[in-house]
Amino acid sequence: MTCPLYICSENTKTVHVGRTVSVRNRKGAHNMSKINTGYSLNECPPIKETIIYSIQQIIVAVFNVIPVPLLIGAGIGLSSSEITILVAGCLLVTGIATILQTIGMGPVGARLPIVLECSFVFVAPGIALGSKYGLNVYTGACLVGSVITLILWTLFHKALTKMFKPYITGSVVMVLGISLCSTGISYCAGGSGATDFGDPVNLLLAAGTIVIMLLLNRYGKGFLSKASALISIVIMSAISALFGKLDLSSIANEKWFRIPEPLHFGIKFDLGPIVTISILCFIALVELMGDQASAAMLSEQRLPSAKESKGGIMAQGISSIISSMFNMVPTISGSANIGLCGITGVTSRYVVSFAGVVIAICSICPKLCAVFSVIPYPILGGVALTAFGTILVSGMNVIRNSELTSRETTIVGVSLAVGIGFSMVPDSLAAFPFWASSLLSGVPGTALTAIILSLLLKEDKMDDDTQKGDEEE
């Protein structure tokens, strides 16, 4: 969190960004003053602290990934034992992918504090295609789609990333934060489909979590500030037990060990599903680019380098291929985990990589996984909502620091309106096929609109003169 620092000067104004204060003078120049409130990107905390801080990341990640195999399995009518196989594969892939992204291997991996997890984007098509063609065909589509996307993004990385100017990336991150806020509110109310959804007690638990976390973050020193999310979760979980909201029975019911099985349901290829999944894989990588920008901004107040961007894309592509081999969906970056880094100030990639190790272990030890998954949704919602708000603000800061021309302002405004507008009224795209509606709303809609407009609205001398005039004032 940003420390309260105000610089009063006629010629400067203070811009608060993550853990750094950016001082912008009247000519638009930025001076960055780093405020050390946690562990930075390449710092490795002592092992005891690493374990504690990683637990915060594990809790958020497990809550995000567990519903993916559960929803797909239930949607296509799998037995409980078959769903268990999907869950094990999902956790194993999330752990491996996170380690690959944070620690890296050669050119692979962004080496930023990013959790890669099985994506909700693929749940709806997974149910639809799995029910119609079988899970083996869906697995084949995920495998081929991941390979195609990885090859295209690797070969044409420079050309593709050149289209994503900072103001476009900022717009994508901002819409990502806005779209995720609805998920956070849903968790606060009890979780989608919960029998007690909207219960005032749920909202009070969420509010209590937010208040405790922010107070510790604002006034706590050292450990209390950095572990604010974990401490608030523990306190509010104990309080939730008084209201009968904490159910520990699933821990006793789970087995101690299970082994993930690759290609348990077989694999088969069909052109139609392959095309659909390939498009969605491309969309997932657009979202990754936004999350990479957010992670770099929160950890080091900069945009990701070309090497980090390409390495992150390669890590997501390879992990999606591995995920397909375990009959699971392609991976995507965990935005909530990135936001959590911004809240606690612990942006160390080693903390996140340790979380990946534990999540991978959870894939063979269901009882350990159950310990993390019994936390009531409203409490997780309080943490998630705060994290998503951090993502939203980081996107706003990228846009603000871009010193927009009138042309770029138009592009940002229209692209935000399209992405946010369609996501607020999804029924307006009901007549379109799934892949088309996915391209037009939310993050993909914002990115696609911004890219098209940036190609149509060419830069001219008037834009340059306008920007120079603003700088001289």
PLM segments and residue spans:
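N-terminal signal-anchor module of multipass membrane proteins
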Residues: 32-113, 121-129
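Membrane-embedded alpha-helical modules
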Residues: 129-249, 356, 360-465
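Hydrophobic transmembrane alpha-helices of multi-pass solute/ion transporters
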Residues: 32-44, 215-216, 229-277, 430-438, ...
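Membrane-embedded helical hairpins/re-entrant loop segments and their flanking transmembrane helices
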Residues: 47, 73-111, 278-349, 468-472
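Intrinsically disordered, low-complexity non-transmembrane regions of multi-pass membrane transporters
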Residues: 12, 19, 24-53, 248-260, ...
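Short, non-helical or kinked segments that cap or interrupt transmembrane helices
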Residues: 107-120, 162-169, 224-230, 328-337, ...
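Interfacial segments of multi-pass membrane proteins
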Residues: 127-130, 337-352, 357-363
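Hydrophobic, membrane-embedded alpha-helices of multi-pass small-molecule transporters
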Residues: 48-65, 198-210, 227-228, 243, ...
